[in-house]
Amino acid sequence: MVRELCEVQGLIFKRKKYKEADILTKIMTKDHGIFTIDVRGALRPKSRLGAATLNFSYGKYIVNTNWKGISSLRTFKDVKQLDQLYLDLTKNAYSSYVLDLLDHAFVEYKDIGSFYDLIMKALLKINSGEDVAVITQMVQLKLLNAYGVAPQLDRCLICGKVQGTFDYSLELGGIICSDHFNSVSQRMHLDPKVVALIRTLALIDIDRLGKVKINPQLKKNSGKVIDRMYANYLDLNLKTKKFLDELALF
């Protein structure tokens, strides 16, 4: 396939050294999915390309590509940076994990559809100071759909009930209403408030998530349940998640 110059709208992440003065970095794009670009001379002093491809930079990038393998960056325009994600260790860790989850859900150059807007909005919210844990949990839940293992959270698995008190079953992959608690032995016996929070984060649009204040213990418990979903449904072993868990210990 012939290589061509193409302008893409995207965000930079996963930057690493390549050869003597180059870097390889991932870019999440609006229309062409996630792919790797070679940024030549990025590590040289005063490199304009290097400055425009720091992690969490976003804008328009002109790449030389044949839509497979490694593309190369030629130039850029209108590039900005989500500076708080770059400078703040906690925000950096959560944002890196969110992008890592997205990266593992898709092959390179595959259109990621609405997940581009989801991730960009999540990162913008984190950058502006909104609750990083709540936003990350929302993204985790929504990305289960990208992996093809989304649980049924909108209604009871047994009878289809949409309102009331619910529990969750990892084995069955969805919520169970209180009418069927006695008949489902595989349920997790969760606090109904935890299930309610998980349902809300999974089902509402990220635009509707305001600057909410959630009880820290409730938030911690919902995070543990979501982690169990990932452990049960997916075989992921992400360094970004390990670092995030280690960070939470301090």
UniProtKB/Swiss-Prot annotation:
A biological process from GO: DNA recombination
Gene3D superfamilies (alphabetical): Nucleic acid-binding proteins, Recombination protein O, C-terminal domain, Recombination protein O, zinc-binding domain
Entry superkingdom: Bacteria
InterPro entries: ARFGAP/RecO (IPR037278), DNA_rep/recomb_RecO_N (IPR022572), NA-bd_OB-fold (IPR012340), RecO (IPR003717), RecO_C (IPR042242)
A GO CC annotation given for this chain: bacterial nucleoid
SUPFAM superfamilies, per database record: ArfGap/RecO-like zinc finger, Nucleic acid-binding proteins
Signal sequence region: none
Pfam families assigned: RecO_C (PF02565), RecO_N (PF11967)
Key words of the record: DNA damage, DNA recombination, DNA repair
Keyword Lipid metabolism set for record: no
Family: Belongs to the RecO family.
Function: Involved in DNA repair and RecF pathway recombination.
Protein name: DNA repair protein RecO
The species this protein was found in: Lactobacillus gasseri (strain ATCC 33323 / DSM 20243 / BCRC 14619 / CIP 102991 / JCM 1131 / KCTC 3163 / NCIMB 11718 / NCTC 13722 / AM63)
Lineage, highest ranks first: Bacteria, Bacillati, Bacillota, Bacilli, Lactobacillales
